[in-house]
Amino acid sequence: MSMMLSNWALSPRYVGQRNLIHCTTLFHTLTRWAKDADDKYHDINSMYENMFTPSNDNVSILQDEGKSDYDTTKTSSMQEDISAFNKDLYNFYNIGYAKQIMSASQLENIVKAKGRFVIQSLSTSPYYNLALENYVFKNTPRAKRGPDNCRLLFYINDRCAVIGKNQNLWQEVDLAKLKSKNFELLRRFSGGGTVLHDLGNVNYSYLTSREKFETKFFNKMIIKWLNSLNPELRLDLNERGDIIQDGFKISGSAYKIAGGKAYHHATMLLNADLEQFSGLLEPSLPNNMEWESSGVHSVKSKIKNVGIITPNQFIAVVSERFQKTFKVDGEIPIYYCDEFKSINDEIKDAMNTLQSEQWKYFSGPKFSVKIKDKGLTIKVEKGMIYDCDRNDLIGLEFKGFLENIDSYT
């Protein structure tokens, strides 16, 4: 793996991966791969499974405790067709199920036991992925002696804007533009600023003990690993600990420390649709509003894609280097999760919290806003107006007030 990244990216294994990503005719691509398939392509071929993973609309999950398979009595005909097609592909081409997805009980046993591992989520649901990350963090045991239980998690989210736990969302995002471009809004469980995700962005989360935690450590490792593959990448670290390339930010970070453990999670812009990001972090608010908030304010930065690395290549490289660098006793395994099998009540509860309007709009810091030309000052806590120059506004939801501001002012 000491060769230049440009050569590494053209190896047969990764050319196949890139062809898969850019293919226009799925069946012809599958056929071409099947003819050349052997054991060394098995991991690449397994990526076909992701293409046929059903959406939440097409799957009903068994709710009974101890069960983790699909409820065949409630499964839609579309899901049955997808499953049948996957099985046909597997039987004919010997591909499709190489990535063994953990059941809920397997996930619980692995996370709550001591040891180091890598988890890759095959889901693109931001609600599931953030809930999974939270589950792994909360349930990782503290090492009383010996090596700490450091873990690495990867996930790729569909379009979404993710604000920090302690941010005033109305100062961070344009809700109307998010809706028009089909971006979900999430408030995560950690601090930090607002970031935008799509399928061209990889999120990684490094978990370790509080004693071993250092905010810039893992990004330094990322830079070292990627630059060693291709020095032309010229990745560097800025004073905030973000990864930059040619002065442009390609990775943003956030952190959480609790219960003697800590994690650093970050984005990596690889081939994101940056055009779609335009304007989403520029709230369309009246110019006569003056804000005061104790919350965290995002730092605006120029961004770009790394460009010559695909998401799957990035995950493969960082996983391999993590396995080699953090190996203690035995190999560090890689596990796979999705929102259909690798889910339990704790993850579901976290997903419900993330999806709730209460968490999105009625949490966050206290703030006040002055409407200058109206001589009006409004104070807000937990999304509710609790103090104002006009008594008739006290007790209103700030969200509703802002959506109908002309009628109130």
Curated annotation (Swiss-Prot):
Any GO BP annotation: protein modification process
Assembly mode: Monomer.
Protein name listed in UniProt: Putative lipoate-protein ligase A
Organism, scientific name: Saccharomyces cerevisiae (strain RM11-1a) (Baker's yeast)
Keywords linked to the UniProt accession: ATP-binding, Ligase, Nucleotide-binding
Gene: AIM22
Gene3D superfamilies reported for this sequence: Bira Bifunctional Protein, Domain 2 (3.30.930.10)
Protein EC: 6.3.1.20
Record-listed ATP binding positions: 188, 193-196, 249
Single GO molecular function: lipoyltransferase activity
